Amino acid sequence: MTDTAQILPTTLEQNPQNTSKKPLLGVNVDHVATLRQARGVGYPSPLAAALLCEKAGADGITIHLREDRRHIQDADVYEMAGQLTTRMNLEMAATTEMLDIACQVKPYWVCLVPEKRAELTTEGGLDVAGQLASLTDYVSQLQAAGIKVSLFIDPEDKQIEAAVNCSADAIELHTGSYAEAGLAGKTDRVNVELERIKNAVITAKRLDSKLLVNAGHGLTRDNVHAIAQIDGIYELNIGHALIADALFVGIEQAVIMMKTAMHR
């Protein structure tokens, strides 16, 4: 039986600095919308899934409103903004259209991510260093609207430094290379990628002790524990693997199982 203390969600009124050593769990429900859009019908509901995730102990809900609207739709964003009881984390590209939507909806978090129309999923981190001036202005506009801003980046010193220079509230470290190495059975590469992530957290905290450090992409119950054990990780955002688990055990149990894997 899972310890109840491990599955209680963190609401907006609770300490946003997460003073416990255990990272929070943000659940991405994009692929509930993927299933819906496959038929172009009104079900299943990403909102209903998100509410069940919160009930089961998710500390936040992540959705990615892509420019091509391949899964999450505008209506989903507005619905969730009015009904979630934890934090909404809206992933989006740094475009004028998305800025307008975010400033209307005012999610608790916006996470800026790169987008390519041909990609199946986000393939890498945002090049903050290469577009520092424009992103600094974009981040400041979101923050002026009362929105906290995270930047999805690869675990590289130059990108972390640029994120700090942008005055971002958080970074989310891309764990895709770590996850892919594990799937390929490349143990040595897994260890290398894990060290990169650990060093990135150290660098981030050295440059700005108040910067929150999240992580995500490709995390599963099999590989999440090593990431969750890294000192300084604030939150893990997990979607595809958790929704896949939900097909067999239900979404509430999938959330509980993921938290158990994180904190075992």
UniProtKB/Swiss-Prot annotation:
GO MF annotations in UniProt: pyridoxine 5'-phosphate synthase activity
Reaction(s) the record says it catalyses: 3-amino-2-oxopropyl phosphate + 1-deoxy-D-xylulose 5-phosphate = pyridoxine 5'-phosphate + phosphate + 2 H2O + H(+)
Cited Pfam families: PdxJ
Protein name in the entry: Pyridoxine 5'-phosphate synthase
Gene: pdxJ
One GO term (biological process): pyridoxine biosynthetic process
Active site residues of this protein: H64 (proton acceptor), E91 (proton acceptor), H217 (proton donor)
UniProt similarity note: Belongs to the PNP synthase family.
Gene Ontology cellular-component terms listed: cytosol
Pathway assignment: Cofactor biosynthesis; pyridoxine 5'-phosphate biosynthesis; pyridoxine 5'-phosphate from D-erythrose 4-phosphate: step 5/5
Compositionally biased region (Polar residues): 1-21
